[in-house]
Each structure stands twice: as C-alpha cells, then as structure tokens.
Amino acid sequence: MSQTRVDFYQLSRDPVDVTVAKLARKVLQAGERLVVVSEDEGQRTRLSKVLWEQGGAAFLANGMADSPHAARQPILLSANCDAPNEARMAMIVDGRWRDEALAFDRVLLMFDAAQRDAAADLWRRFAKDDAIDNRINKQDENGTWREGR
C-alpha cells in the first residue's frame, strides 16, 4: 500500500498568497502538476492573479478547474479535490481538510492560527494511520520553510 504524504504548513509569517506562489513554483520545478483547493471563489480568483503576476517568464500558468482546457493547465484552482489536469499533488489553502485529498500522492495543508486546533486534531488522527505520512513545516525568520517537529 502506498502512503499519502500530508505536509502541514501553519501560516504565521507570510500570507497565503505568498506561500502558495513559493510552493507552487517548487511543485512545477519538480515536474509535477498541482490542484489548489479552496471553497472561497474570491480566494481562488486572487490566487490565480498572484500566480500569473509573478513577473516576466517567471509567471505560473494556471486556470480554474471548471474552465475549458483545464486538463492542459499545470496548476488548477478548484473548490474541490477533482484534478482534470491529472495532478498528483494538492494544496489545500482554506485550512479545511477534505478526506478526498487522500487520493493524491502528496497534500500540502495550509492553516492559520485560528485553525490550529483543528489541524492538531487532524495531525493526531493521521499519526495513527499507516497509510499517511504526515509532516510539519515551519517558517523561519527569513521566510524559508523547513520540515520540523
């Protein structure tokens, strides 16, 4: 049985849009496709704009999961965990876990201080499940994310 890796990211220094852009770039550099999940349509629209406006050739091409040609996009923004672009990675940016995300090889779960207790409960649940490899990532004072405990 293969494991799903779930990386927990507590947003404390940088806002979600900055963190999404940094991590999405790394996903693409690794040759992967990505689904960015948020129930909030306004958040999805803002994130799409941020990804496109990265500057020059460094922009991050993306589209909405319900748009034409979604399958061609390296990054999709979606209200759910569907992946018409055949992504094996998902980034949940509204802090609300969805069990459907366990179908991906890897999931990045972002949460803020208000969602810390729910994330801690989820961490404890996953720690008991051999099918899940859960890890915590912490941001240092320079904005670099590092795996921590």
Regions found by a protein language model. Give the residues of each.
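Phosphate- and divalent-cation-binding pockets in alpha/beta enzyme and binding domains
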Residues: 43-50, 118
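Glycine-rich, aromatic-bearing surface loops/beta-hairpins
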Residues: 105-149
